Amino acid sequence: MTTDPDRLGAKAEAGGATGPPLTVTLLGTGTSTGVPVLGCACAVCTSADPRDARLRTSAHVVAHTDAGDVHIQIDAGPDFRQQALRHDVTAVDALVVTHEHFDHVTGLDDLRPLFFRNRAPIPVVALPRTAEALHGMFRYIFDRTYPGASLLDLHPVGDAPVRVASRSVEGAAVEVIPLRAPHGAFEVLGLRIGAFAYLTDVGEVPDAVRAALAGVEVLVLDGLRPEPHPTHLTFAEAAEVAAAVGARETWLVHVTHAVPHVEADATLPDGVKLAYDGLVLEVGGTEA
């Protein structure tokens, strides 16, 4: 594992975060099985509403800096190739991996065509445990043992902000603030960029993370279903977090096939909505 301080610097200032305008595309909003679920004929799995069709949860963030755009991919699960083609993802300057569960990482090798565009290594940002797991899962990539593989560099992160730089535009960079929250017995990685934050696959949101989310305008947050789950937030728990941090709008992701979009969305409080695949969020450059 290597760290390139020019590409990914961990010396950024802590405290208030000023971010550029962002375009956030939710590539997938479904739980680990995706929706429709294989073999299921429930009302949601057979729904004609495209918002009920949910690929595995991931997102693509484009930061529009003065120097140029920076493209950050959040997770690359088994649907990543399909998602990237559907939503015209043509560049990835860094991959942020929330955790090592299969629905978030098994599309990692589909970054190859984007690497080959300029052959600059793609940083893979993850918590240390996740980075270790990724190395074990994809040794042929990270050990450089296969000549046709892309060059992906693991970057274990802690609590310090990091700067992600464009792989193609000189001087274009954005600060990313890591967020750590429990997903059952281990932690997952969330992030904040300026007025935007993303936190999926969490069973609770600790006080330290809530403090780091203060002033966020747009929050993408785990919300599996109305009923309790040991490692995911319920709709009510997610709404409580959104209210506590003062988010202007909160979009729930990682949603199961037990949730019909129209009916469930109507039950949520003001400012909290069910996300859906292909949703595009424009977040203005603000100081938080």
Outline where the language-model segments fall.
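Binuclear metal-dependent hydrolase catalytic cores
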Residues: 2-199, 265-287
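Cap/insert and terminal regions of metallo-dependent hydrolase folds
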Residues: 204-286
